[in-house]
From Swiss-Prot:
GN (gene name): eif-3.C
Keywords, ordered alphabetically: Cytoplasm, Initiation factor, Protein biosynthesis
Subcellular location: Cytoplasm
Biased composition (Acidic residues): 12-22, 169-189, 203-214
Keyword presence, Protein biosynthesis: yes
Bias kind Gly residues: ranges: 855-870
Biased composition (Polar residues): 215-224
Species in which this protein is naturally found: Caenorhabditis briggsae
A molecular-function term among this protein's GO annotations: RNA binding
Record region (Disordered): 1-28, 162-235, 824-894
Protein name: Eukaryotic translation initiation factor 3 subunit C
Bias (Basic residues): 884-894
Length: 894
């Protein structure tokens, strides 16, 4: 309909048409305005950022580096390997952009490469941490290490990495790329006032045009003009959006101010002329009223009030300790007596132990030293005065804190505090880095702890006649001193320390009723004797205690101590030259392949088999580092003992089909060495012993000695013994003797007579020693020979077959076994006159008990039915007897 006819329509039609047109126009305008606002929004509300391509690449690299660092912190090496490949590809793509803009290698990228390389190398060298990795992480570790090394070398980053290691960035330092990262975010300045006025005018004109259209939209010229103005305005806004602006630089100080967090401070409003005082969150505890006299009752009441907050969740533990210390100062200032002072001091010690929310958490070193000083002060006070009795047998009603005419009686035990303090020191050492100076500093506290334990022992001996101690507490004090003494080797005053050790152990043997402390004291005593080379006494004490029979029923800590004692006893036997005894003692630990775990020197290598709680318990049982037994030394001693025992045994049983092994682990090492296609010079102690074993098997004792005693072995093994020269002489002597025995057993079928003088010169032994060794071999029937004294010769009887004869016998045995196996395989396939019924396949069914009673050799009767053949029988189930027991049929081989 044209507008001319539309003007003449009725009012109702006009109103309805106006509404329709307005709605249509409003919807169209709103849709276009939304699209325009989407584009123009950043300019009006936010500051638009124009960034260079270099900055975008920097952001991409930093994002990938952050992902890799997250994977490193989570110890996800598989994800770290994938992330490193992605990062390397992204960096290679970005190098062209960097070269185009004359940008060198970013320092943050070099820093990341150094961090990852250090992390991977540290993890590679740490055997315990590497063993604790999962299977996927273990597989990813080696490729990651190789890729990282190859990437740095191929991309020419070796010099940059070395320069960074020489001058690393400090913590919190930002590289120029990091500092300019935000500078590159160039910001568009806000619109000028003139431009804002222009916008306001445009908006007003737009609103005016809208109003005119709403009231007088029927006129064609006005409508066209308003549409043109609106289009011009929209195009102007589009032009402004895509227009490049001039940028202004902000100072770095302004940017740093923007980075700082804005702290909103609430204003203190004054109302009704009242003075308002800001109150802190922590309540300031007012202990006493200034107008009140501080007496014993007031102090006890205030102490109970402070102690009532103990253990509550809302209680500040540090503030609780401070309150008790303030009470102690007031009590000493007012001179309220020893009873109050000792009671408050004991409460302070308990509060210091409770600073940690969890018992499993270890105490901070500063808190430990503070507690140690407090316990030491209280113990000095208890030793100097005999008017104070501190015992767990007293109840709270029986306490006497204020009556000076009587003895002060206080509930508590200073011995339990000393025991718990000793446990806290062990936790601190367990959680400290054993390869740092921090561990050494913390280890110095053990000296103070030992002095405190000796002081507690003196206090027990002074007050034990009063009956204020429990028997178990007294045994614990003696046991603590034993546990701080038994593993230490004493160069000086050995006699005094040995007497002290005997005295302490005898005290526990007498007083303890639970047997656990007696067992531990016995094991510590044996350990102490073994460390100080008292071999026979230590062995007899261990055998008399029968610990090897009852240790399986003991607790885990006692089993760990037993394992440590057995290892130390084996090392002691080796130092004395008792090779077989040393081998037996060390084999119990070395054959399990879990030596560190059994000695509580490391957590198990398979943590997935244990729950988190079990793993935490295992970590709490770990022995501090300064008490460790050198596992590498122990393994080397075990392998040397195995060599001295196994090589002569192998020579005597060379051609036996089934020979007995004395050491499976030693044979495993020999087999692994034989499998190697190329054998280089030995590097570690294990390879030295294997090479020496091969030389001994050939009778070359000098080469064997050179492998065992050299500079490298001196540093790793022999210098760790306090009598290193004696031990090395003993080992060389045993190598000569066992090499002689191996030589005679190997070549006994070759010689008819051997001169003793020749043997003595060959193995650098005296004629007397050679005669003694050969005589012992003849007596033990290891060698079939006779000593001819007039000629000083060894005459071989040659009863044993020669090497060729032994090989022929072995071959005949194997052929006989092969023939028997073939007969058994072919026997079920050969026919025996055709099918004779189902019983013919089961030889055990040839004859039955019922058939014997009938007097027949087989089943001839009729069962379950009519005749089955021409003679009226169902079948013949066997015609031969003689076997009443049914044997299972051998499996058929095809």
């Amino acid at each position: 309909m044209s507008r001319f006819y539309r003007r003449g329509a009725s009012d109702s039609d006009t109103d309805s048409s106006e509404d329709e047109v307005e709605e249509l126009k409003a919807n169209k305008s709103a849709k276009f305005r939304d699209d325009l606002d989407f584009m123009a929004g950043p300019e009006e509300d936010e500051k638009r950022v124009v960034r260079a391509q270099k900055d975008k690449k920097f952001d991409e690299l930093k994002s990938l580096i952050k992902q890799n660092r997250d994977a490193k912190s989570n110890k996800d090496l598989n994800k770290l390997l994938t992330g490193f490949d992605t990062l390397a590809k992204a960096y290679d793509k970005s190098k062209t952009i960097f070269q185009r803009q004359n940008v060198t290698n970013p320092r943050f990228y070099i820093r990341f490469l150094v961090e990852i390389e250090d992390y991977v190398n540290k993890l590679w060298e740490d055997k315990e941490a590497k063993a604790a990795l999962s299977k996927n992480n273990t597989k990813a570790l080696s490729p990651l290490r190789q890729k990282l090394k190859k990437y740095i070398k191929d991309h020419g980053l070796t010099d940059l990495v070395s320069d960074y290691r020489a001058n690393p960035d400090e913590d919190g330092y930002e590289t120029p790329e990091d500092e300019n990262d935000e500078d590159d975010f160039e910001e568009v300045p806000e619109a000028s006032p003139g431009r804002q006025a222009e916008r306001a005018a445009d908006s007003e004109s737009e609103s005016d045009s809208d109003d005119d259209d709403s009231f007088n939209w029927s006129s064609e010229p006005d409508t066209n003009s308003s549409d043109d103005e609106e289009n011009v305005t929209k195009m102007e806004q589009l032009r402004r959006y895509f227009l490049k602006k001039e940028f202004r630089e902000e100072s770095k100080d302004d940017k740093k101010d923007k980075r700082k967090r804005v702290i909103k401070v609430k204003e203190v409003v004054e109302e009704d002329d009242d003075d308002w005082t800001p109150v802190s969150r922590e309540k300031s505890v007012v202990h006493f009223d200034p107008n009140e006299e501080v007496t014993h009752d007031v102090m006890i009441k205030k102490l109970n009030e402070v102690m009532s907050a103990r253990g509550k969740r809302t209680t500040d533990r540090n503030q609780h300790v401070a309150n008790l210390q303030k009470l102690l100062e007031v009590a000493e200032e007012k001179q309220l007596g020893l009873g109050i002072s000792v009671k408050i001091s004991f409460c302070i010690i308990s509060a210091l132990f409770e600073l940690n929310a969890k018992i499993s958490d270890y105490m901070e070193y500063e808190t430990f030293m503070n507690t140690l000083r407090t316990v030491n002060t209280l113990l000095d006070l208890l030793i100097t005065t005999d008017r104070v009795k501190l015992s767990v047998t007293y109840a709270e009603e029986d306490e006497n804190l204020k009556d000076e005419n009587e003895e002060y009686r206080i509930q508590g035990s200073i011995l339990i505090a000393v025991q718990r303090l000793d446990g806290e020191l062990a936790k601190i050492l367990q959680n400290a880095d054993c390869h740092s100076n921090d561990y050494i500093e913390k280890l110095k506290a053990e000296k103070d702890m030992c002095q405190l334990i000796e002081k507690a022992e003196n206090y027990v001996e002074l007050r034990n006649h009063l009956g204020i101690f429990d028997k178990h507490e007294v045994c614990k004090v003696y046991m603590m001193r034993i546990e701080h003494t038994y593993y230490k080797y004493q160069d000086q005053n050995v006699g005094e320390v040995a007497k002290t050790m005997d005295y302490l152990c005898n005290k526990i043997y007498t007083l303890d009723d639970e047997k656990r402390l007696r067992q531990r004291a016995m094991l510590c005593h044996v350990y102490f004797l073994a460390v100080h080379d008292k071999w026979h006494r230590a062995r007899d004490l261990l055998l008399m205690s029968h610990m090897q029979a009852i240790v399986d029923h003991s607790d885990v800590d006692t089993q760990i101590l037993y394992n440590r004692t057995i290892c130390q006893l084996g090392l002691c036997a080796f130092r004395h030259g008792f090779i077989r005894e040393a081998h037996q003692g060390l084999s119990e630990i070395q054959n399990t392949q879990r030596a560190k775990e059994l000695l509580a020197q490391a957590v198990g290598t398979r943590p997935h088999e244990k729950t988190a709680e079990q793993e935490k318990i295992d970590r709490s049982r770990q022995v501090p580092y300064h008490m460790h037994i050198n596992v590498e030394l122990m393994e080397c001693v075990y392998l040397i003992c195995s060599m001295l025992l196994e090589i002569p045994h192998m020579a005597s049983c060379e051609f036996e089909m089934r020979r007995r092994m004395l050491s499976r682990s030693f044979h495993y090492q020999l087999k692994q060495s034989e499998k190697a296609s190329l054998t280089g010079p030995p590097e570690n102690t294990r390879e030295h012993v294997v090479a020496a074993s091969k030389a001994m098997l050939n009778g070359d004792w000098k080469k064997c000695k050179d492998y065992i005693v050299n500079e490298k072995m001196n540093q790793k093994v022999w210098n760790l013994f306090h009598n290193a020269d004696q031990v090395k002489d003993m080992v060389v002597r045993r190598i000569q003797e066992e090499s002689l025995r191996t030589y005679l057993l190997t070549y006994s079928t070759v010689y008819s007579t051997v001169s003793l003088k020749k043997l003595a010169s060959l193995f650098d032994l005296s004629k007397k020693d050679v005669h003694s060794i050969i005589s012992k071999m003849i007596i033990q029937e290891e060698l079939s020979a006779t000593l001819d004294e007039p000629t000083d010769c060894l005459i071989m009887h040659r009863v044993e077959p020669s090497r060729l004869q032994m090989l022929a016998l072995n071959l005949s045995d194997k052929l006989q076994t092969l023939a028997e196996n073939n007969e058994q395989i072919l026997e079920p396939r050969t026919g025996r006159g055709g099918y004779q019924g189902p019983g013919s396949w089961f030889p055990g069914r040839n004859e039955r008990q019922g058939d014997k009673q009938k007097g027949s050799g087989g089943f001839q009767g009729e069962r379950r039915g009519g005749p089955g053949g021409p003679d009226g029988k169902r079948g013949n189930w066997g015609s031969q007897g003689g076997q009443q027991r049914r044997h299972p049929q051998k499996p058929r081989a095809f």
